[in-house]
């Protein structure tokens, strides 16, 4: 396993002329679900086809959570379970918070995993984008935040309006691997809302109340955003 290498080779067609298939399992919070939606949009753009079962997939991707001990254990259990369920020759890829926070440990202790993809790795790209947030808390060069998403299959949808956090709470490690606050522009968010075609929008972020501060929008800048979104949905 090479945690910092790009995943382009993993995503090469295994059989020429046949569409490649993937299975994506998402763990953790609604923000992780948004990340998975954006990964699926990227997969679709690259010609990958989703399947309903890991034993039908050429690639099995686990979007992990590492917020608390129980979440980390669930991530490990899921990785092991999907590793057992995948068909012979299928690749097992681990991404998400656990891949970023504990990538080296996963690589060392879980031989079932073929690739660890921390934040900043373009999963479908051919070039690695190495990321090490650590004490410098650098933002990923490749960011899921503004990737397009497919239309929502449900009447409601989560929309992530910012990534990262500027607070330094002693009980929370999220800023060390999600990076500093990065707010999206109102135009970017409204475009995503329109494309989702959902009747109800739930806004999510690591720190919703801080939306816009890093962009110089001032305090309570989330209020005009909410009003504009409300004008667009039923």
Regions found by a protein language model. Name each.
Residues 12-212:
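Proteins enriched for Cys/Gly/acidic motifs involved in redox and nucleic-acid/cofactor modification
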Residues 1-14:
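Single conserved hydrophobic/aromatic residue that forms the stacking wall/gate
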Residues 218-234:
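Alpha-helix-loop-beta-strand connector modules within alpha/beta enzyme cores
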Residues 5, 184, 220:
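Residue-level signal for the nucleotide or nucleotide-sugar donor/cofactor binding architecture
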């Amino acid at each position: 396993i090479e945690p910092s290498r790009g995943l382009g080779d993993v995503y090469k067609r295994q059989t020429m002329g046949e569409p490649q298939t993937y299975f994506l399992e998402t763990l953790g919070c609604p923000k992780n679900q948004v990340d998975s939606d954006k990964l699926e949009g990227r997969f679709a753009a690259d010609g990958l086809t989703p399947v309903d079962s890991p034993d039908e997939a050429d690639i099995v991707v686990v979007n992990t959570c590492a917020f608390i001990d129980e979440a980390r254990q669930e991530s490990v259990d899921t990785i092991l379970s999907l590793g057992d369920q995948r068909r012979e020759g299928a690749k097992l890829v681990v991404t998400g918070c656990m891949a970023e926070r504990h990538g080296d440990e996963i690589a060392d202790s879980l031989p079932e995993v073929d690739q660890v993809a921390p934040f900043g790795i373009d999963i479908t790209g051919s070039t690695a984008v190495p990321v090490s947030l650590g004490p410098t808390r650098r933002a990923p060069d490749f960011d899921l935040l503004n990737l397009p998403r497919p239309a929502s299959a449900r009447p409601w949808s989560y929309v992530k309006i910012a990534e990262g956090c500027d607070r330094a709470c002693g009980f929370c490690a999220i800023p060390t691997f999600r990076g500093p606050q990065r707010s999206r522009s109102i135009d970017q968010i409204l475009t995503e809302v329109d494309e989702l075609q959902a009747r109800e929008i739930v806004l999510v972020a690591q720190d919703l109340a801080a939306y816009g501060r890093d962009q110089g929008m001032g305090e309570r800048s989330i209020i005009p955003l909410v009003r504009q979104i409300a004008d667009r949905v039923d």
